[in-house]
């Protein structure tokens, strides 16, 4: 069977949070359209049928392979949570905003949010791609409260065209997060591995508690922890084909946890903050 597209239109604007974790290509695969309309969705903790919240258009039966299923939310809402939960294949498109936990525990496939999304986008994901055209909330690609470092994102790619809240990449182990705009405090806190690239500014203390991985700040930084030591200057940096062609100062840390994480901070955007560090390290042929 060829690929199939299912379009979902919200009947009314949601007043409470909707748990949409059952709306995935994996759940749709191999089911009749009549079965899909009866999928259970939680509306404010109350069980309801998918057809009570959405009008559904699509073929009479979904392909048995989730990779051939595309789900399009024709109307988005910041109340739609858990979109793409544990999906392994296929594609989800949200034509608008999305709520918390988009792509939570995602294992593959792709999610595109054409608006903004709330907290925990891609939290604990293992593979796949998430692209958000707008901004995202806190802990994109992160772990949950109380979990140990390394329990966050374990693979895949998250691209955010707008800004991100605090603690982007919190506790991540692998994978790549690219933020085109700015980010809040504690980018890459408790990281074990992976990469977080913030092309714009970030808040206080990027990399706090990190023991591995890489954080890149292409704009201004609020402050750097004293438990990071300046290592060297580099003329530019590339991450997954994205090249930031300007000088960066490389810091190593967080030594409080015996960390060997890499923190790259744009020199030109932080001359006042970094001039002292520059005097402590040996330049490697970079004019600054």
Task: Show which residues each predicted segment covers.
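Intrinsically disordered, low-complexity terminal regions
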Residues: 1-78, 82, 129-133, 137, ...
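LRR N-terminal entry segment and analogous cap-like coil->beta motifs
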Residues: 75, 89-90, 94
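Metabolite-binding pocket within alpha/beta catalytic cores that recognizes anionic/polar moieties
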Residues: 79, 83-86, 98, 102-105
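Tandem repeat scaffolds
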Residues: 87, 106-107, 118, 125, ...
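Intrinsically disordered, low-complexity linker/loop segments enriched in Gly/Pro
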Residues: 93-102, 112-121, 133-144
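Generic detector of contiguous secondary-structure segments
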Residues: 109-127, 199-204, 209
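Short, well-ordered secondary-structure micro-motifs
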Residues: 143, 170-171, 190, 228
């Amino acid at each position: 069977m060829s690929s199939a597209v299912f379009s979902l239109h919200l009947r009314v604007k949601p007043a409470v949070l909707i748990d949409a974790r059952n709306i995935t290509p994996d759940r749709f695969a191999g089911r009749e359209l009549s079965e899909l309309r009866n999928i259970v969705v939680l509306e404010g903790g109350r069980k309801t049928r998918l057809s009570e919240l959405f009008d559904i258009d699509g073929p009479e039966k979904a392909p048995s392979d989730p990779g051939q299923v595309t789900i399009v939310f024709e109307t988005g809402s910041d109340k739609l949570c858990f979109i793409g939960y544990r999906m392994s294949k296929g594609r989800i498109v949200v034509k608008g905003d999305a709520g918390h936990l988009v792509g939570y525990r995602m294992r593959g496939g792709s999610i595109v949010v054409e608006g903004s999304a709330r907290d925990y986008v891609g939290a604990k994901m293992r593979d796949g791609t998430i692209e958000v055209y707008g901004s995202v909330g806190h802990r994109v690609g992160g772990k949950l409260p109380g979990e140990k470092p390394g329990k966050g994102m374990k693979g895949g790619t998250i691209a955010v065209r707008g800004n991100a809240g605090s603690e982007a990449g919190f506790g991540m182990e692998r994978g790549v997060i690219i933020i085109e705009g700015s980010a809040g405090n504690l980018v890459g806190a408790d990281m074990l591995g992976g990469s977080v690239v913030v092309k714009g500014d970030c808040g206080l203390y990027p990399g706090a508690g990190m023991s591995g991985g890489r954080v890149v700040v292409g704009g201004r930084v609020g402050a750097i922890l004293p438990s990071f030591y300046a290592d060297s200057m580099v003329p530019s940096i590339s991450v997954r084909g994205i090249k930031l062609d300007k000088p960066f100062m490389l810091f190593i840390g967080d030594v409080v946890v015996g960390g060997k994480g890499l923190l790259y901070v744009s020199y030109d955007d932080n001359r006042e903050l970094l001039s002292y560090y520059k005097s402590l390290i040996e330049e490697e042929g970079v004019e600054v």
